[in-house]
Amino acid sequence: MGAKHIGFIMDGNGRWAVAHGMPRQEGYAHGLVALYKVAKRCSERGVEAVSVYALSTENLNRPQGELDSIFKVVEKFNLTYDGEYKISYMGDFNSLDDKLAYSIEQVEEKTRDNKGMWLNIAFNYGAKADILHAAKVAYDHGEFLDDTFEKHLSSSHLPPLDLIVRSGGEMRLSNFMLYEAAYAELMFLDKLWPDMDEGDVDKILDDFDKRVRKFGK
């Protein structure tokens, strides 16, 4: 059975920009172009959900100019998106600018009844914080068991995570969907995120289809 839910750690946007003689912050707009290509091909190949790591809570320590560029790209995407995907976000939005937080709310509402693939965006997100929040809610409701605990995670509306792909050459999960990754396959690519395209998706999915998943057995 093919992958139904893939997580992408979109690493390498800043390095790509520098390698092409641009300021680091310009890499994020090019990264969005790559995301459109990757998501489109995933949808064509029958993937039901794509989760992408757009901004970690730790990334908030980056220079303000770089953060402003990320916020601008995300806000523009939210305000202009008119495709078929169902857009969802997970993360802490309380510390975000009101206008950016509102754009997140708007795009989720606008696409709620769409029939396409889920495009789930982790933004100002950290898996450890998400797990702790889910544990607290589950405990408060007296239902701290696996099958009930999971419904309090930010990803509870999505299929189980099958595969995590990280671009950019690093080999770590960086606090991305740690609970959901328990039995997920992992793939690490040297290619920088803005260079990702449809052909890479085909290679990723073809590789996944050859793997034998044991789910801890």
Summary of predicted features, one role per range:
Residues 1-217:
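Flexible, compositionally biased loop and terminal segments
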